[in-house]
Design a protein with these regions (language model features):
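Binuclear metal-dependent hydrolase catalytic cores
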Residues: 1-206, 283-320
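Cap/insert and terminal regions of metallo-dependent hydrolase folds
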Residues: 200-209, 214-313
Length: 320
């Protein structure tokens, strides 16, 4: 399994010389796995990084794109109207995301692509989109099989399948499950309903978790610990340093470097990649937040882990 970052900036895109190392596109990640069907690409979020990602997918001849949405703030959706694949009607685009206030993926796309905000109404391109609302985060599991593609199961059916190896009512065997990419979900601490995704590549045992747009908490809830536990790579929101957060950013729904380090240590994650870099942060400030994470680990009994902390950068590829 491998991940490529196409957008690691939070809140708004930036473009200035002082951000050239980590980049300025807003959130978009691509996941590579042998569990994906041939000709299929798996993405997380559709910030401005979706535009270069879509260009790469077009060059590869990708025929189906699965996009998992964490939530619908502008910095996670602004790539949709400008991505080439929005207009390629011979490519299927499947969008999965939470539903809140009556708004799921379809309603979000209808809203951001309509007059007077955008010249192309979503109805004109919707025929090759498939929109799926995830209404029970924590009670659903996505399973992607290389031959059968994605399906969403209830947690009880998924656990029954794991325990008994019976196809039952879900139409999937235990053997097929072990050939699949399993994606679990957890609700983050953020002003709107936001989803963290855990990716488990069953054939290799590799695990990655993306925890973006998540606020610091005094303690780690058991559900969150279990969601992250044993991850080979944790990509986590570390938008602020501690002084910024305490001065004026608490309650914004984002985290700090020292908190991300604590999550890494307490859940046993092997590596930690910071993401959702603040738009005001130059490269040296992003690196300073990494240093803050490393210092926390050294001061709290995990010095060996300090060197496994880094900041994600646009166009970076990470083997898991």
């Amino acid at each position: 399994m491998k991940v490529k970052a196409y957008g690691t900036r939070g809140s708004s895109p930036v473009a200035r010389p002082q951000t050239s190392v980590f980049g300025g596109n807003t959130t978009c990640f691509r996941f590579y796995s042998d569990c994906l069907p041939s000709g299929t690409a798996l993405l997380l979020d559709a910030g401005s990084g979706l535009v270069p990602a879509s260009r790469d997918l077009a060059a590869e001849g990708i025929r189906r794109i699965l996009i998992l949405m964490t939530h619908y703030h502008h910095d996670h959706t602004q790539g949709f109207p400008l991505a080439p694949h929005t207009y390629f009607k011979d490519v299927t685009v499947q969008v999965y995301g939470p539903k809140e206030y009556g708004v799921g993926p379809r309603e979000m796309l209808d809203y951001i692509m309509q007059a007077p905000f955008f010249p192309v109404d979503f109805a004109r391109v919707a025929s090759h989109f498939e929109c799926h609302a995830l209404e029970n985060i924590g009670c659903e599991v996505m399973v992607i099989h290389p031959d059968e593609g994605p399906r969403v199961l209830r947690v009880d059916d998924f656990e029954r399948l794991q325990g008994e190896g019976s196809a039952g009512v879900v139409g999937l065997s235990r053997a097929a499950l072990e050939e699949s990419l399993v994606i679990r979900m957890h609700k983050t601490v953020h002003p709107e309903y936001t989803v963290s995704y855990r990716f488990e590549e069953r054939p290799t045992g590799k695990v990655m978790v993306v925890l973006t747009d998540h606020e610091n908490t005094d303690s780690l809830p058991l559900d969150l610990r279990n969601h992250i536990r044993g991850a080979d790579l944790l990509v986590q929101d570390a938008q602020y340093d501690r002084s910024q957060y305490e001065a004026s950013r608490a309650g914004f729904g984002h985290g700090t470097g020292d908190y991300a380090a604590r999550v890494m240590k307490e859940t046993g994650a092997a590596r930690l990649g910071h993401t959702h870099h603040d738009p005001s942060a130059d490269d040296d400030q992003v690196e300073a937040i990494v240093a803050e994470s490393r210092a926390w680990l050294r001061s709290n009994g995990a010095p060996a882990r300090a060197e496994n902390v880094f900041a994600c950068a646009d166009y970076q590829e990470i083997e898991i």
